């Protein structure tokens, strides 16, 4: 965290906790994230994939601005409301979630529940090499399964711009580019 603080704004934009959340529960890192918060370093935390909604609530309590995966929030109305209230964006990774058996099929992927609840979601690859995917494939997978078109893709991209760990000026320029493209 101290190293991240030294380089914040010079190639470092946040602190991330990623990995096997079932083996290394999010709660074990509370002191680390409290320290990051004290140093004003934004935080993203891997939660709600292998572990349940309790890991998502812990990530929120620890100050996460974004949550890697968080897919299990879709099965709990209170957790979705918590994410919405705190303006926390979920970094969804459909192919990875299929590979790890979080869902049995893309048709069962609960992205619509999250969107309908007003939770901000982005589309991501997780580990491109392990999952043998790319961002274009992730978007196409969802477009095919849920009939998503430009409107939904634009929404995902807007959420990504808004949740990015950068200045408001850059966020606005990203959004303008998205608007121009769509």
Predicted feature descriptions by range:
Residues 100-101:
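Glycine/threonine-rich flexible loop motifs
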Residues 15, 46, 67, 90, ...:
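Divalent metal-coordination and catalytic microenvironments
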Residues 105-153, 159-160:
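Flexible, acidic glycine-rich loops studded with aromatic residues
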């Amino acid at each position: 965290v101290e190293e991240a603080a030294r380089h914040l704004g010079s190639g470092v934009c946040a602190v991330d906790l990623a990995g096997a959340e079932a083996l290394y529960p999010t709660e074990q890192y509370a002191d680390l994230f409290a320290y990051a918060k004290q140093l004003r370093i934004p935080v993203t935390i891997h939660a709600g994939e292998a572990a349940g909604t309790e890991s998502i609530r812990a990530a929120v309590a620890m100050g996460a601005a974004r949550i890697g995966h968080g897919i299990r929030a879709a099965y709990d109305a209170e957790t979705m409301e918590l994410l919405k209230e705190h303006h926390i964006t979920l970094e969804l990774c459909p192919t990875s979630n299929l590979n790890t058996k979080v869902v049995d099929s893309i048709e069962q992927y609960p992205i619509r529940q999250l969107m309908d609840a007003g939770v901000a979601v982005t589309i991501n690859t997780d580990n491109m090499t392990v999952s043998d995917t790319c961002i274009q494939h992730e978007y196409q997978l969802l477009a095919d399964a849920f009939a998503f078109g430009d409107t939904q893709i634009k929404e995902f991209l807007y959420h990504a711009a808004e949740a990015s760990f950068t200045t408001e000026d850059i966020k606005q320029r990203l959004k303008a580019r998205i608007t121009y493209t769509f």
